[in-house]
Amino acid sequence: MIRGSLREQGEGGSLGFWFAAGVLTLFLPSCVAPDRDHHIVISTRDQKLALVEKGIVIGTYPVSTSKFGLGDGQGTYRTPLGEMEVAQKIGDDAPLGAVFKDRRRTGEVLVPNAPGRDPIVTRIIWLRGLEAQNSNAFARDIYIHGTPEERNIGKPASYGCIRMRSQDVIQLYNIVGRGARVTIVDQPLADVALVPKPRVFR
């Protein structure tokens, strides 16, 4: 947007002005303060995700973690445990069911439970591990993302990622920012210190 507005002003600007504008455009996203208000807690035992805002649980969502179990080894297709953070968010304003390949939209849009299809859809929340037990998470492309296989939400069915219904992942995506804390545990949410009873969205 900065570059577009500069073009509209004409081409008579100084070289220093253009250079400064280019640097600002390049690095402005990285200057955004990390989200310290939100905390995502995922229970592989319950197949549920709790969203915490400033210490208060504001909602829970059903999810689907790996059908291959837990772990962080390369090529294992398992869901890692432990402390992570939201590294990147991909899919702003993409329509519900928009298909992604290599984190880019293909132009295809799928309806929920489209037969024979299992791509990443709607939104991508890319996770980065913060501990030794999940240090490969970012390189393994571990995401929270939408799935067309909504019939399998609530049971382990993924290849390592955390799957959500498209409507739910849009809701989550619009609330949490980069840097938000993410914790994946192999215990019931009831055993995790989340305080007040959550309001269930579905």
Give residue spans per PLM region:
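N-terminal secretory signal peptides that target proteins for export/translocation
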Residues: 1-12
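Structural motif
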Residues: 46-48, 83, 124
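C-terminal motif of bacterial Sec signal peptides marking the signal peptidase cleavage site
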Residues: 29-30
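Well-ordered beta-strand positions in beta-sheet-rich domains
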Residues: 39, 60-62, 83, 141, ...
